[in-house]
From Swiss-Prot:
The gene is glyA. Belongs to the SHMT family. The modification N6-(pyridoxal phosphate)lysine is found at residue 230. Keywords: Amino-acid biosynthesis, Cytoplasm, One-carbon metabolism, Pyridoxal phosphate, Transferase. One of its GO terms (biological process) is tetrahydrofolate interconversion. SUPFAM superfamilies: PLP-dependent transferases. Its main location: cytoplasm. It comes from Nitrosomonas europaea (strain ATCC 19718 / CIP 103999 / KCTC 2705 / NBRC 14298). (6S)-5,6,7,8-tetrahydrofolate binds at residues 121, 125-127. Homodimer. The record marks 229 as: Plays an important role in substrate specificity. Its EC number is 2.1.2.1. This is Serine hydroxymethyltransferase. InterPro entries: PyrdxlP-dep_Trfase, PyrdxlP-dep_Trfase_major, PyrdxlP-dep_Trfase_small, Ser_HO-MeTrfase, Ser_HO-MeTrfase-like, Ser_HO-MeTrfase_PLP_BS, SHMT-like_dom. Pathway: One-carbon metabolism; tetrahydrofolate interconversion; Amino-acid biosynthesis; glycine biosynthesis; glycine from L-serine: step 1/1.
Length: 416
């Protein structure tokens, strides 16, 4: 029998020290990585329950194991809440990640060698949208579309030309570093014109979509996937939504083709996050996320930095560092020394290598969860600019670190 009084600190002090260090890092550093956020205490609690003990291969009411009465309730809650949140018909909450959700979509609808038309990774797409280093680019014939070099927005004319030239079986919309509104209906029309499936990966925009501040692709696309963290502010995981005629193929593609038992403790946390996302407080939060991103982009422009495509319509944007003669890797390192966390990111047609880059990506979901509003976002953008103006100046980095820590103290993530 286990003693419920035993703690991680008592059982595994080495691991506990690492966890404590990460807790402190999250509290003491300002998080600007666009794909990161802070899960609520309720989401964290759900992931730490005895649901982790339960195997439940299959789906509610159709399990391969006994004893699934309560996990069926848990999964059905997640299913119903996700369906209501995005006005979806079919949903699957079992994918362990966004990448696995995407893989399930491909396997459900495509055959090896079929043509896939997705956004170029170099222009803001994702590895799983046909990159040569990902299975999506190895199993399928991957063709990439990109951005208009003048506007740095999706080149819909090029997309249509490529679609007619290559006749893809599937067109993929969605991005990992694209700051503007994506026209799902334009994608739908192009897909229909060439007889292709339309698949939308809305992982980055899901929270904004749930709140009504970004167009909803559900009902427009044949398939929609998302992660459940990022702007949705849930646990790390994935989901699939689709038109009902794809239910059988998708269920099979998730289990048994790509996964075995679902992670019931994570599905419980997804259910909590979906409930939180249906609240007015969450809608207000998403509105503030966008306002904070726009404020930061404007201030950085005023400080002499170029924002890719000129502005942002969502939670993130790319900063071109070439005018500062600075690489993304150098900027990431300098900002981390000043207690501000970003990620290096390629800009469109970046001359630098992927692990060096000419830009950084900035996102505001995490700082908005802390409680930052426009004044704090303006102050923070100026701190970022101070570091980018003098990345090798230790005195500047120390001064910015002190100011960043003061903001963190004023706006804690979890408090005590």
């Amino acid at each position: 029998m286990f003693s419920q009084s035993l703690t991680i600190e008592q059982v595994d002090p080495d691991l506990w020290q690492a966890i404590k260090g990460e807790v402190q890092r999250q509290e003491d550093h300002i998080e600007l990585i666009a794909s990161e956020n802070y899960a609520s205490p309720a989401v964290l609690q759900a992931q730490g329950t005895v649901l982790t003990n339960k195997y439940a291969e299959g789906y509610p009411g159709k399990r391969y194991y006994g004893g699934c009465r309560y996990v069926d309730i848990v999964e059905q809650l997640a299913i119903d809440r996700l369906r209501n949140l995005f006005n979806a018909e079919y949903v699957n909450v079992q994918p362990h990640s966004g990448s696995q959700a995407n893989a399930a979509v491909y396997l459900s609808a495509l055959k090896p060698g079929d043509t896939l038309l997705g956004m170029s990774l170099a222009h803001g797409g994702h590895l799983t949208h046909g990159s040569a280093v990902n299975m999506s680019g190895k199993i399928f014939n991957s063709i990439s579309y990109g951005l208009n070099p003048e506007t740095e927005e999706i080149d819909y004319a090029e997309l249509e030309r490529l679609a007619h030239e290559h006749k893809p079986r599937m067109i993929v919309a969605g991005a990992s570093s694209y700051a503007r509104v994506i026209d799902w209906k334009a994608f739908r029309q192009i897909a229909d014109n060439v007889g292709a499936y339309l698949f939308v990966d809305m992982a980055h925009y899901a929270g904004l979509i749930a709140a009504g501040y970004y167009p909803n692709p559900v009902g427009i696309a044949d398939f929609v996937t998302s992660t459940t963290h990022k702007t949705l502010r849930g646990p790390r995981g994935g989901v699939i939504m689709a038109k009902p005629e794809h239910e059988k193929a998708l269920n099979s593609a998730v289990f048994p083709q790509t996964q075995g038992g679902p992670l019931m403790h994570v599905i419980a946390a997804k259910a909590v996050a979906f409930k939180e996302a249906s609240s007015q407080a969450f809608k207000d939060y998403q509105k503030q996320v966008i306002e904070n991103a726009r404020v930061m982009a404007r201030v950085l422009q005023q400080r002499g930095l170029r924002i890719v495509s000129g502005r942002t319509d969502c939670h993130m944007f790319l900063v071109d560092l070439r005018a500062k003669n600075l690489t993304g890797r150098e900027a990431e390192s300098a900002l981390e020394a000043a207690h501000i966390t970003v990620n290096k990111n390629a800009i469109p047609n970046d001359p630098q290598k992927p692990f060096v880059t000419s830009g950084i990506r900035i996102g505001t979901p995490a700082i908005t969860t802390r409680g930052f509003k426009e004044p704090e976002s303006e102050e923070l953008a100026n701190l970022v600019a101070d570091v980018l103006d003098a990345p090798a100046n230790t005195a500047v980095l120390d001064q910015v670190a002190r100011k960043a820590q003061a903001l963190c103290t004023k706006f804690p993530v979890y408090g005590n």
